[in-house]
Design a protein with these regions (language model features):
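Non-catalytic helical/linker scaffolds that mediate oligomerization, partner binding
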Residues: 1-321
């Protein structure tokens, strides 16, 4: 069977016309299936990102190549449970989540998360545990489907899932960051991102701030699953929306500033106003030199009190040259 039907192509064109952020590609069997969609997007110079839905054995077998070809992965457990032995689903879910973390790609766990809430106002204990276990595996996102599309209690389902996730994440934060090995790309940005995450545990950093033109630095930070928030200052709404899918990232669209110092101070004031950091807390700033057009190339750690000191000098002097 072809990866795309004529109806699929019509729907992709509609997504392009409406400037949709993501396309969820169903029943992906191989990287070639992903490429078939990507070729259409590229032909129209579209920046839409592909989320590949893993729903069959062939997709599971080719998961590494599919992850590489996709922006992110959705573990669609409903159809997957029909295509493969149902007792294998928990192990497949765990393995795919870890593969996505290692490859720094967003991963979504979906289908039958709170299935009983389609008809009932409260979930089963098993459903609560299922959601918590997905959080304990460090998934980037959870997705409801029938519960909100046709269920009797859509708002209650969202509120219930949010409460479970928030509670489970507190346990994750006690465990610290994941010691994910650096990739073989010898990326300076990746090295600095891991250093910033390690600082949350070894130096006591309470918040990481980064400016992100493409979202890449924020995604690097997300892959290490740190215990404290990452504030990503985005230059446009598109990147802000994409980063909503990344673990622990709080994307904020700020108007472009002329230098890193103004970006940094705007972010610090925002985080303090929201109550994420106190005057005595340490914060890390991970960024690149805006005027030089370079990538992420410096990491600075200070207390908030030091930053607000009138004598504080921002160390990124290269942006002024």
């Amino acid at each position: 069977l072809p990866a795309l039907t004529e109806k699929d192509k019509v729907n992709i064109q509609l997504a392009i016309d409406e400037d949709i952020d993501f396309i969820a590609h169903s029943f992906v069997r191989s990287a070639a299936d992903v490429k078939a969609v990507q070729d259409i997007l590229d032909a129209h110079h579209s920046e839409i990102k592909i989320i590949s839905k893993i729903e069959n054995q062939e997709g599971v077998d080719n998961i590494d190549d599919i992850i590489d070809a996709s922006y992110g992965i959705m573990i669609a457990r409903g159809d997957l449970g029909i295509e493969v032995p149902i007792e294998q689903i928990p192990g497949i879910q765990r393995d795919i989540i870890m593969k996505c973390i290692l490859k720094q790609k967003p991963v979504i766990v979906a289908t039958q998360m709170l299935h009983t809430m389609i008809e009932n106002p409260r979930p089963t204990r098993a459903e609560v545990t299922d959601i918590a276990n997905a959080i304990y595996s460090y998934t980037d996102a959870l997705m409801l489907s029938g519960e909100t599309a046709s269920g009797k209690y859509p708002l209650e389902a969202v509120q219930t899932m949010a409460r479970i996730a928030e509670t489970a994440e507190k346990d994750n934060h006690k465990r610290g960051y994941i010691d994910v090995p650096l990739s073989n790309t010898k990326s300076q940005r990746e090295f600095l991102a891991k250093s910033a995450i390690m600082a949350t545990e070894q130096v006591g950093v309470k918040c990481i701030i980064t400016d992100s033109a493409s979202g890449a630095t924020a995604r690097h930070l997300a892959s290490f699953r740190g215990p404290h928030p990452v504030l990503a200052m985005c230059y446009n709404d598109k990147i802000q929306r994409l980063l909503n899918l990344s673990y622990g990232v709080l994307p904020v669209h700020l108007a472009n500033h002329t230098d890193n110092e103004h970006m940094f101070m705007a972010a610090v004031r925002m985080m303090r106003q929201k109550g994420y950091i106190k005057l005595e807390d340490k914060i890390a700033y991970l960024a690149g030199y805006i005027t030089n057009g370079g990538g992420t190339n410096f990491l600075e750690i200070n207390t908030l009190k030091q930053v607000f000191d009138p004598n504080y000098k921002f160390h990124n002097t290269m942006s002024e040259k």
